[in-house]
Amino acid sequence: MSTLHKVKAYFGMAPMDDYDDEYYEDDDRAERGAARGYARRPREDRFEEEGYIDRAGREYDDRPAPREYDEPPIYRGGYDEPRFDPRLRGPREFERPAPRLGALRGSTRGALAMDPRRMAMLFEEGSPLAKITTLRPKDYSEARTIGEKFRDGTPVIMDLVSMDNADAKRLVDFAAGLAFALRGSFDKVATKVFLLSPADVDVTADERRRIAEAGFYAYQ
């Protein structure tokens, strides 16, 4: 429709039906043109306009499935911990190798050690301990033997290791009373090992220590 014809129709100088028909024809042509333009656009442009394609240009159906991890990664100090491998593990303190048997030879010390040279010095002729004897009572009934040896002037070592605690305590009380009655001395040498010394035998603290170190009472 020309501009002049539109002006005439507006002021009633031309029929309105012609104006309406041409108006609707223009609208139909515009809609058909838009439809043809939409159909001619690439498939990706149409999908992107309607929201079916993401920003990376991939269709939703083409997205890879998320990876599945067997186990979550472990972080310590800002980096991934290496996989545990027993071969790479260093020695732990409680897994120290056992010492060789050869290293234990000659390592006995204290009351269980026996030095022949010390034994000779302790019990050389003329020494107060030259006639010492060791008794290993099994029960309290052997207290009489201990008393007789001590009464005859013989130093006695009482080894009570094999006795139960009750009988050992009774025998210790007996020996202490015996030493007090005969003016002797009663000394502990090692665990459950005691020395009864007569009044005329003076055993110094150093000699008692050497007796314990020599450990001769365990071998007599």
Curated annotation (Swiss-Prot):
Protein biosynthesis listed as a keyword: no
UniProt cross-references to Gene3D superfamilies, sorted A to Z: SepF-like protein
UniProt superkingdom = Bacteria
UniProt cross-references to InterPro entries, sorted A to Z: Cell_div_SepF, Cell_div_SepF/SepF-rel, SepF-like_sf
Q: Which GO terms describe its biological process?
A: division septum assembly; FtsZ-dependent cytokinesis
Is this entry keyworded Cell division? yes
What cellular-component terms does GO give this entry? cytoplasm
Name the UniProt key words of this record, in alphabetical order: Cell cycle, Cell division, Cytoplasm, Septation
Any idea where this protein resides? Answer: Cytoplasm
Q: Where is this region: Disordered?
A: 33-82
- Grouped into one coarse class, the protein's main location is cytoplasm
Where are the compositionally biased (Basic and acidic residues) regions?
52-70
Q: Which family does it belong to?
A: Belongs to the SepF family.
Q: Which HAMAP family does the annotation name?
A: SepF
Q: What does this protein do?
A: Cell division protein that is part of the divisome complex and is recruited early to the Z-ring. Probably stimulates Z-ring formation, perhaps through the cross-linking of FtsZ protofilaments. Its function overlaps with FtsA.
- How would you summarize the oligomeric state and partners of this protein? Homodimer. Interacts with FtsZ.
Which named protein is this? Cell division protein SepF
